[in-house]
UniProtKB/Swiss-Prot annotation:
GO terms for cellular component: cytoplasm. Catalyzes the GTP-dependent ribosomal translocation step during translation elongation. During this step, the ribosome changes from the pre-translocational (PRE) to the post-translocational (POST) state as the newly formed A-site-bound peptidyl-tRNA and P-site-bound deacylated tRNA move to the P and E sites, respectively. Catalyzes the coordinated movement of the two tRNA molecules, the mRNA and conformational changes in the ribosome. It is found in: Cytoplasm. Keywords: Cytoplasm, Elongation factor, GTP-binding, Nucleotide-binding, Protein biosynthesis. The lineage of its organism: Bacteria, Bacillati, Cyanobacteriota, Cyanophyceae, Synechococcales. It comes from the Bacteria. This is Elongation factor G. Belongs to the TRAFAC class translation factor GTPase superfamily. Classic translation factor GTPase family. EF-G/EF-2 subfamily. GTP binds at residues 17-24, 81-85, 135-138.
Length: 691
């Protein structure tokens, strides 16, 4: 079966930004104008098509990256609407990995926010070409040129306006297209009756000025056009279009558009720009991967090339497990067998679907450049490569950040224990930043994630999707332990209980290991003073103790243990006895090696009106924070700091009350650092009291 759209007329794009910039509303309008939906859904009414999870509709935020297909001007556009909340960074990360282009949405009032910078960095990591839509031009305080300036200064982007707003705030009536040098005047509330006319006389000078800036910027980035521009001082409309597209594809240029998705102004022009300026799958470099022999190879975006795809999301679904894939090359047919080259297992493709949010359409095949979902995969998880069984390749996987917060979870009734286990396994399959473990001392199930909201949503999903009611403990910080000194440790386990006894004796030297080395073991036993078969159990005893910690029950990291001596008994020694002796020696050594507690430090960025700067800095200092920098821009203060995660619980509420609801902040993991002695003593005594 032939393709519906040739590859050059396919666009795989993401819509990304910080919270409340209007991403989901922009997506809704795109679907409305392109005919996918016939009624406009509002985020604040809980009716958005892409916010299809119950929690998203209640909270008015986008949690998971919903994939939708639509068409415009005879082009297929596959859209991923990504979340703006930092707890759901993995959703943005996995979207960026599989997209060809991005619309970055900014609020015309708020401008560049901390989360905007995180999203921009993620797009940089995967070299994704992008354009900007400055949204909410109807809002009080909207300032298009101020936001444009912030994009240039803070994001270091070579941005250039290709539009100007006609009016602003309540007076927004239209948009000037600087490429065509025409004005688009909106005559009705739905944004469908548009009059294209000459630029209004009172804006002619402004439009001419910015059109010249556009021509100069394009000429500087395009050798073919610079001579023409220097000779005539003018570029044609088609020159401008070609120059913008070339600049975007080469990452030299970021076109900036404007409008108000909520007021239905400017969205059709955004769709035109997606078609005109963002890349098709064949415009981006072919995907790279590794062959079984370790050599690098590429897969061109071509239906005739060997099949390769990346699984970028796994999702539980009433009909079975949905695995979202980005097709990079070849054709994937339903009923076929493929190789999961990451895990070296074969998988069968039961069914294939393309999605329109929570609506789906079954298809017989997916082709190079498509975004779709597969049913029937049993062993494939996020970041795995699927490829032809006779032509294996492993594609670059996703960057997954480590979780920083954990809570204990237990079912409200004993009978729900099995349901809870199934729910946790299913959720961990979907979300690589969600981890599940069993606490060795208490036997409790502990879940870990990227933040309070992240875990709250997952617990909510356990109830809604898996019908498991759970009791949740208070959020706990993922502390670590390490040592700062060196020493010897000895463990002797000897027990006589009538008949055969138990005997194991281990002596070790302990010292700090290299950063991020975890646990390292070296065997220096010579002359058979401890038989070889008891070395491994002794190491295992040390390793298990290392994982459960010594001073406060947290994993011990970056430690090097060398087994130097010991003794055994011909009759009474056993593997279990040496495992216990190894654990005893490890604990003995740690206590003499100046053990310390480490805590996760978070990079916290706060934006507040200038009037609140003093109280916010004072509050961060009281949370053991280190203020690293501050700047003031047009009445808005930005404070950068490093703060222990333990001090940040409930900060969102505190910041709202300190700034009368006008402050925002972003937080992401930075590094581990020693906990101050007085704080560490309190944590240690609390943990010893609980054990």
């Amino acid at each position: 079966m032939a393709r519906d759209f040739p590859l050059e007329r396919v666009r795989n794009i993401g819509i990304a930004a910080h919270i409340d910039a209007g991403k989901t509303t922009t997506t809704e309008r795109i679907l409305f104008y392109s005919g996918v939906v016939h009624k406009i859904g509002e985020v604040h009414d809980g009716a958005a098509v892409t916010d299809w999870m119950a929690q998203e509709r209640e909270r008015g935020i986008t949690i998971t990256a919903a994939a939708i297909s639509t068409s415009w001007n005879n082009h297929r556009i596959n859209i991923i609407d990504t979340p703006g909340h930092v707890d759901f960074t993995i959703e943005v990360e996995r979207s960026m990995r599989v997209l060809d282009g991005v619309i970055a949405v900014f609020c015309a009032v708020g401008g560049v926010q901390p989360q905007s910078e995180t999203v921009w960095r993620q797009a940089d990591r995967y070299s994704v070409p992008r354009m900007v839509f400055v949204n909410k031009m109807d809002r009080t305080g909207a300032d298009f040129l101020k936001v444009f300036g912030q994009i240039k200064d803070r994001l270091k982007a070579n941005a250039v306006p290709i539009q100007l707003p006609i009016g602003a705030e309540g007076e927004l009536s239209g948009i000037i297209d600087l490429v065509e040098n025409k004005a688009h005047i909106y005559k009705d509330d739905l944004g469908q009756d548009i009059e294209v006319t000459d630029v209004p006389a009172d804006m002619k000078d402004e439009a001419d000025k910015w059109r010249n800036v556009l021509m100069e910027t394009i000429a500087e980035n395009d050798e073919d056009l610079i001579e023409k521009f220097l000779e005539s001082g003018e570029l044609s409309n088609s020159d401008l279009k070609r120059g913008i597209r070339t600049g975007v594809l080469k990452h030299n240029l970021v076109p900036v558009l404007c409008g108000s998705a909520f007021k239905n102004k400017g969205v059709q022009l955004v769709l035109d720009a997606v078609v005109d300026y963002l890349p098709a799958p064949i415009d981006v470099p072919p995907i790279q991967g590794l062959l079984p022999n370790g050599k690098e190879a590429v897969r061109p975006s071509d239906d005739n090339a060997p099949f390769s795809a990346l699984a970028f999301k796994v999702m539980a679904d009433p009909y079975g497990k949905l695995t979202f894939v980005r097709m990079y090359s070849g054709v994937l047919e339903k009923g076929s067998y493929v190789l999961n080259s990451t895990k070296d297992t074969k998988e069968r493709i039961s069914r294939l679907v393309v999605l329109k949010a929570d609506d789906r359409e079954e298809v017989d095949a997916l082709r190079a450049g498509d975004l779709g979902a597969v049913l029937g995969l049993k062993n494939t998880t996020t970041g795995d490569t699927l490829c032809a069984t006779d032509d294996p390749i492993v594609l670059e996987t996703l960057f997954v950040p480590e979780p920083v917060i954990s809570v204990a979870v237990e079912p409200k009734t004993k009978g729900d224990m099995e349901k809870l286990s199934k729910a946790l396994v299913s959720l961990a399959e979907e979300d690589p930043t969600f981890r599940v473990r069993t606490d060795q001392e208490t036997g409790q199930t502990v879940i870990a994630g990227m933040g309070e909201l992240h875990l709250e949503i997952l617990v909510d999903r356990m109830l809604r999707e898996f019908k498991v009611e759970a009791n949740i403990g208070a959020p706990q910080v993922s502390y670590r332990e390490t040592i700062r000194g060196s020493s010897k440790g000895e463990g002797k386990f000897s027990r006589q209980t009538g008949g055969k006894g138990q005997y194991g004796h281990v002596v070790i030297e302990m010292e700090p290991g290299e950063p991020e080395s975890g646990f390292e073991f070296i065997n220096k036993i010579v002359g058979g003073i401890v038989p070889k078969e008891y070395i491994k159990p002794a190491e295992q005893g040390m390793k298990e103790t290392c994982e459960s910690g010594v001073i406060a029950g947290y994993p011990l990291i970056d430690v090097k243990c060398t087994m130097v001596d010991g003794s055994y008994h011909d009759v009474d020694s056993s593997e279990m006895a040496f495992k216990i002796a190894g654990s005893m020696a490890f604990k003995d050594a740690v206590k003499k090696c100046n053990p310390v507690l480490l805590e996760p430090m978070m990079k916290v960025e706060v934006e507040i009106p200038e009037d609140f700067l003093g109280s916010v800095i004072g509050d961060l200092s009281s949370r053991r924070g280190q203020v690293e920098g501050q700047s003031v821009d047009d009445g808005t203060s930005k404070v950068s700091s490093k703060v222990p995660l333990a001090e940040m619980f409930g900060y969102a509420t505190e910041l709202r009350s300190m700034t009368q609801g006008r402050g925002i902040f972003s937080m992401e993991f930075s590094h581990y650092e020693d906990v101050p002695r007085n704080v560490a003593e309190a944590i240690i005594s609390k943990n010893q009291g609980n054990s």
